[in-house]
Regions:
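Bacterial N-terminal signal peptides that target proteins for export
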Residues: 4-14
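N-terminal signal peptide c-region/cleavage motif recognized by signal peptidases
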Residues: 21-23
Length: 187
């Protein structure tokens, strides 16, 4: 009886130490891209195994503190900040995913949304990432590959919009023709 209690206590201690050890060595990385409407980029990317979270927001502009009101995001692009575990999903897998979920042949906007704020771009932190993105881009890609700049999260009501407002989100996505065009590109 005492031996079994001792063994159970040892197993519990080992389990706690294992959890502490794993959490102290787990890490994440980030990746930013623009692919049109951030509701869609967030929805398309958040479901990938190894993606911890996706935050909708703005990047690559000069307007201080952009907001989601017409004209108040200035020259920023809508973007997704992807927080991921590189032990579970590689950066090259994420980059390939981006090219499958954007219209890489259109740099004037995406689908029904037009203008710079909806235009695609993929951002890099260093030369390795820049070269990796370039090597994975489809031959017909016109997507700019740019240095990462400050990211500004959008208001909470726009985070996880596809989950909070599924009817409106799905209507918008269908009306915009996003999936129809992606099916054409990814034949």
């Amino acid at each position: 009886y005492l031996y079994n209690m001792f063994l159970k206590a040892k197993i519990k201690i080992f389990s706690v130490l294992l959890i502490i050890f794993q959490s102290s060595f787990s890490f994440s990385d980030t990746f930013i891209y623009s692919g049109g409407c951030f509701w869609c980029t967030e929805a398309d990317t958040e479901k990938l195994p190894g993606v911890i979270s996706v935050i909708s927001g703005f990047t690559s502009g000069t307007t201080p503190n952009p907001k989601y009101y017409p004209g108040e995001w200035g020259d920023h692009r809508e973007a997704a900040l992807v927080n991921f575990n590189p032990n579970l999903i590689s950066l090259d897998t994420l980059i390939k995913h981006v090219f499958k979920t954007i219209d890489y042949e259109d740099n004037e906007g995406q689908f029904c949304d037009r203008g710079r704020s909806y235009s695609p771009a993929i951002y890099y932190k260093n030369d390795y990432e820049k070269n990796l993105i370039s090597s994975l881009a489809p031959k017909s890609s016109v997507v700019p590959i740019e240095p990462e700049t400050k990211f500004f999260p959008v208001r909470e009501e726009h985070q996880d919009y596809y989950l909070k407002n599924p009817f409106q989100y799905n209507f918008y996505r269908y009306r915009c023709g996003r999936d129809f065009r992606l099916d054409e590109l990814n034949k």
